[in-house]
Every structure is written in C-alpha cells, then in structure tokens.
Amino acid sequence: MKKTLSVLFLMGVCFGANLADIQKDKVIKIGVRMDQTPFSAMKNGSFEGFEVKLAKAVAKKIVGEDVKVELIGVNAKDRVPFLQDGRADVMFANMTVTPERMKYVDFSMPYLSSVQSLISKKGANIKKISDLKDCKTLVIPGTTSFDYVKSHPQLGIKDVECENSKDCFKKFQDGEADAYLHTNILNATWTLMDGSLEVSLPVVGEYEFIAAAVAKDNKELLKAVNDALMSLSSEGEFQKLYKDILEPYYRGKIEKKYLLLDDVYNSLSL
C-alpha cells in the first residue's frame, strides 16, 4: 500500500471533487467506518453514529439543507486510497492525524482525541508494554496501532492482523491472540461487550488527534470543512452529539476530554 501511495503522491494525483463542483451538484461523498460503534456503524441497512451525524451536519453547512450525502463504507486501509482516487470527497472515519498520512491527505481541525491502549483478559498480568514480548497481539493494518507495533520491533510483539473491529473481536474470542492494541475510545467498546476483558494498559505511546481528511491540496474543500466545524462548535452541536450519543454509550468509561474538544475550538475563535 505504501508503494502505491508513494506513486500517487509523486504524480500529484488529486481526484476528490472540488468545492465548486460539490456545491453545484449538491452531492458530497463521505467515507465512514462500517463497524465502529458509537462513531459509525452499518445497522439495519443504514449508517449511524457520532461521525455520521457530524458528517451530515458538516455537509449541510457546506452545501445547504438540500445536500445529498452519499456515505461510503470504508475499512482502515481504504481511507487514504479512497480520497486519492475520488471514491470519497471527505473522510469522517476515525482517522488519526499522523505525519505519514499528512504526506498524502490534508486533515481538518480535530474533533476527537485518543491514545493507544491495550485490551487483554482479566488476570493476564500485563502491567507494562514490555510484558507483551512474545504475546500475540491483534492489530488492524492501516491504523496507528499497527504502525506502533511495526515501529517498535525491539518489544518482540507478535502481531496478528485482523480486518476490522468485528473481525478482531471474533479472533480474540476464538483464542487467536492474547491482546488487542487500538485507540482507547474504541477499546472501551470491548469492555462494555465482554466483562471478562480489561484495559490492561490504558496509555501506549503518544496522545493523538482524530480529524476529517480530504485529498491532498484540496484547499477550498478543506477550508469549508474547517469553517463548518467551527460553526457547529459555536452552535453547540458537539455538546449535543456528546450528550445524545457518546455520554450514554460510554457511561463514564472514557474521560470527556477525549470526546469533546470544545476548548480547542473556543481558543481558536478568540
């Protein structure tokens, strides 16, 4: 995948629709994850969740109330290629901002924050990252958790690849791995689903931000997304989505600071 991305980058490819076309056609294609409750998941034939609601609100700000939002389901490894070949105009897909990804796409202001954490069975006695030596650990290609394991070979972690959260959970339940490394805001879902699991390492690596993304150098669309996010923050939309979706789902398992970045937006609007 990295080789393909490099070729596209060198060619200067940018297939995402520009802002003028989106506003003229009143259609915007937005990539969302297919299995990441409470952010985005396909249920009963349609997408729902925090990022889905946010994406639709942003689309209305950019185009108007009569916008047609085409939601495109993506897995982690799809996100950059879909933006580069025009299958999506914008990603609201739990996409962590990283220097590597910034070579190929442009990120908006963040709307969530997170940190890597580790899930294991209760009693597994994993107290520090070095305890993962020779442990089979589930990671999803295309994510920052996958990158973390690959960039720390000295830890001796035996990575087991899985396609998405649902696939990872099944493999864990089937005994194919000892642990699962992913962002804390997604790992909390596992402990809600299975009381035999625990967050054995709540912080692995550095704190991260999650943002929307557009194709590289699609500057007008990026500005429109940022303007929409600022406007929605000032109107209290983030607070509403937090109270309606995230707060009742997590029930205090994730600190509010990860899920609500109004302080960031308030500081930028001064």
Give residue ranges: language-model regions.
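Sec-dependent N-terminal signal peptides
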Residues: 4-13
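Bilobed "Venus flytrap"/periplasmic-binding protein-like clamshell domains
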Residues: 34-38, 47-62, 117-165, 184-185
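Extended ligand-binding regions for polar small-molecule ligands
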Residues: 53-57, 61-62, 130, 135, ...
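A ligand-binding cleft/hinge motif common to bilobed small-molecule-binding domains
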Residues: 78, 94-103, 148-151, 171-206
